[in-house]
């Protein structure tokens, strides 16, 4: 998952840029704790959003609550799929088969179609489940696999990031960033 850059399908994904300010982790346990913390804080923001409002768009280019969750489900699902496919000896297509990193509008629309009909509760439960799968997977990785580049073919793109960075940008970073987006949505839509 990339840090959301909007719907411009020609945007360069955030993972293609060097980011010296990206959080780092001492070990897998620290990354797992960060995932749980960021996810809990993100999902807490949905507690007072009514199911009837999940498709309400606050601003023309903004995301609805359902789209925010679909985006998260899509990218965490892709991360898990990349690993599953590689471990099964299959060719992994990143970001997704038929798409390139400079054209992410298609996958986003697929995420919205695939997950947009879920209730907010169902989407949150599914996201918790996928995050738990990611954490379980992280516990199986050696320090070398997690922190050194070139440990997976799916991670060997132009960025040459180690797995931990891919996990961070598909979990902690968007959970944190989109929490702010949901708060802004609520300020514009929820009234006392």
Language-model-detected regions and their locations in the chain:
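Proline-centered turn/helix-capping motifs that create local helix->coil transitions or kinks
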Residues: 139-147
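Alpha-helical bundle segments that constitute or directly flank the non-heme di-iron/ferroxidase center
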Residues: 24-53, 74-84, 169, 173-176
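Short, contiguous alpha-helical
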Residues: 55-106, 146-192
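Short linear/disordered segments characteristic of secreted peptide precursors
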Residues: 9-10
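Short, helix-capping/interhelical loops that line the mouth of catalytic, cofactor-
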Residues: 13-30, 78-129, 189-192
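A non-catalytic, amphipathic alpha-helix used as a structural packing/dimerization or gating element
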Residues: 34-41, 122-136, 173
């Amino acid at each position: 998952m990339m840090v959301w850059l909007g719907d411009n399908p020609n945007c360069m994904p955030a993972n293609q840029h060097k980011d010296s300010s990206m959080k780092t982790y001492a070990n897998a346990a620290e990354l797992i704790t960060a995932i749980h913390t960021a996810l809990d804080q993100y999902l807490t923001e949905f507690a007072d959003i009514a199911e009837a409002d999940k498709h309400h768009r606050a601003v023309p280019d903004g995301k609805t609550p359902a789209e925010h969750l679909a985006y998260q489900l899509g990218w965490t699902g892709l991360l898990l799929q990349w690993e599953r496919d590689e471990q099964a000896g299959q060719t992994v297509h990143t970001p997704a088969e038929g798409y390139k990193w400079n054209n992410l509008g298609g996958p986003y629309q697929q995420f919205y179609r695939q997950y947009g009909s879920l209730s907010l509760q169902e989407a949150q439960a599914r996201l918790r489940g996928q995050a738990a799968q990611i954490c379980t997977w992280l516990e199986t990785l050696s320090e070398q696999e997690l922190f050194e580049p070139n440990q997976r073919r799916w991670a060997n793109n132009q960025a040459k990031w180690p797995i931990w960075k891919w996990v961070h940008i598909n979990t902690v970073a968007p959970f944190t960033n989109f929490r702010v987006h949901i708060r802004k949505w609520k300020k514009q839509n929820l009234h006392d």
